[in-house]
């Protein structure tokens, strides 16, 4: 099946998530208007989706020290930053580095660049430039999907917030242009989940467990505005008691699997 082949090729971390539906959730959760057109509900590599980035201004600003609204998460790092406002951008899920030589090469590479390890993002060739240029973003989603292998078979599981609200996942974006073609793309940043009370149960045994770097709601502006040398301080595992996991029904799974291009 297509999903299994994809997972085998890239390690099957966070390759599939559920987009935020149109309506009031975008302004309520992210302080921006909703997209003008509905997105596909299930987002896979190379599918179009939206992310939130910074529309920069010129003057420097120091973020407020009390931006962390969620209790239980460590304090937000502060420091001089570039002032800007949030901007919703349509892009491809799966980052295309600026040095890619052709659109065909971009298609092949982006499928494997849907996740960026936070520990090595500053040194990995595919993501380093985006990180150093401060091209950070927030990826809105209702849930992400991971396989539960505890029964010996892969059971896709939907992982969402306990309160049902959207999540904002830390990401990077990039703009690729060559020979009259342009691709705006993004990737999800991930953190280690070996010791996470919930996420350590998922993905295949014997491999390092990973999870998306979910941001606290009060940290969105600080994440987008922080200097790159401070940005890694936002890479933390989201509290397990704020998340819930529910298996996906088999009939629905077959429909999801066919959605991979």
How does the language model describe each region?
Residues 2-8, 12, 24, 67, ...:
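C-terminal accessory segment of soluble enzyme catalytic cores
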Residues 2-95, 229-233, 258:
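Extreme N-terminus nucleophile/cap motif
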Residues 42-46, 86, 132, 152, ...:
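Short, surface-exposed loop/turn motifs at beta-strand boundaries within globular domains
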Residues 70-128:
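A glycine-rich, hydrophobic loop/mini-helix early in the fold
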Residues 91, 98, 160-192:
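A motif-centric signal for short, conserved binding hotspots located
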Residues 119-122, 189-198:
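Short, structured beta-strand/loop micro-motifs enriched in basic residues and often containing a Trp
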Residues 125-151, 218:
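Conserved SET/PR-domain catalytic core that frames the SAM/AdoMet-binding pocket
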Residues 136, 148-168:
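Catalytic cores of histone-lysine modification enzymes
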């Amino acid at each position: 099946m297509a999903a299994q082949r994809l997972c085998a090729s890239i390690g099957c971390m966070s390759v599939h998530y559920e987009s935020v539906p149109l309506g009031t959730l975008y302004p309520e959760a992210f302080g921006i208007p909703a997209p003008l057109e509905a997105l596909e509900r299930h987002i896979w590599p190379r599918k179009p989706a939206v992310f939130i980035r910074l529309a920069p201004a010129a003057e420097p600003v120091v973020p407020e020290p009390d931006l962390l609204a969620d209790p239980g998460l460590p304090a937000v790092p502060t420091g001089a930053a570039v002032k800007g406002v949030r901007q919703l951008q349509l892009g491809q899920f799966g980052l295309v580095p600026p040095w890619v030589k052709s659109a065909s090469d971009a298609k092949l590479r982006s499928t494997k660049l849907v996740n960026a390890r936070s520990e090595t993002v500053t040194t990995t060739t595919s993501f380093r430039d985006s990180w150093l240029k401060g091209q950070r973003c927030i990826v809105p989603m209702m849930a992400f999907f991971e396989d539960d292998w505890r029964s010996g078979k892969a059971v896709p599981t939907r992982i969402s917030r306990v309160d049902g609200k959207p999540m904002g996942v830390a990401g990077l974006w990039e703009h690729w242009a060559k020979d009259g073609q342009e691709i705006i793309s993004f990737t999800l940043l991930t953190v280690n989940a070996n010791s996470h009370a919930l996420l350590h149960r998922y993905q295949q045994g014997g491999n390092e467990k990973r999870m998306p770097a979910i941001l606290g709601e009060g940290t969105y502006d600080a994440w987008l505005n922080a200097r790159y040398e401070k940005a890694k301080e936002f890479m933390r595992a989201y509290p397990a008691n704020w998340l819930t996991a529910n298996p996906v029904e088999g009939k629905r799974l077959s429909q999801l699997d066919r959605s991979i291009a």
